[in-house]
Regions:
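N-terminal small-residue-enriched
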Residues: 1-173
């Protein structure tokens, strides 16, 4: 395929691409250890609008059969459904016991160890944006000039700045 001409244009993403973008570009920024250290774009934004109205972002460890699902995190806290953004407002970070104590809230069941040698830190389980009311075909039809992204690869994220770059592996003009 021929390389398209660059420039500003609308982007519509398929489910897989939008999931990767949400996980990498936003999800890690909800992890409380980054916020506690002031390293996230969402540090000090609790209770403020961080997304357009109507956007709900959830981390849910209770989805049966999902790769990120679990009964208990690595600290023995039950896995749960945590609403991080509700109607565009930041309502919760993802917590382990340490960050929960720091913020004066209950742990969210996101304490995760890299191995038995490491201490738990707050990490996502199954983070997603809830579906809206728009029909995917109507969204695509509403774009006069743009790109539909089916798949990303090789990305880079700076969670403290809200800056990210991804290579479009599969997309259509």
């Amino acid at each position: 395929a021929k390389r398209p001409k660059g420039g500003q244009m609308s982007v519509v993403m398929g489910a897989g691409a939008s999931g990767i973008l949400l996980h990498e570009a936003m999800g890690h920024a909800f992890e409380a250890d980054f916020n506690r250290k002031g390293q996230s774009i969402f540090s000090d934004k609790m209770g403020q609008r961080v997304c357009p109205e109507g956007i709900n972002i959830v981390d849910d460890a209770t989805i049966r059969g999902n790769r990120g699902s679990l009964n208990f995190d690595d600290e023995g806290v039950p896995g749960q459904r945590t609403m991080m953004v509700e109607n565009g407002i930041l309502t919760s970070y993802l917590h382990d016991r340490i960050s929960a104590k720091f913020y004066g809230v209950a742990p969210t069941g996101n304490g995760r160890r890299e191995s038995f040698r490491s201490s738990p830190i707050p990490r996502m389980r199954a983070t997603y944006m809830e579906s809206g009311n728009a029909n995917p075909e109507d969204i695509i039809a509403s774009v006069e000039k743009g790109v539909y992204v089916d798949e990303f690869s090789n990305g880079q994220v700076k969670i403290g700045e809200g800056d990210f770059t991804f290579f479009v592996k599969s997309g259509y003009l």
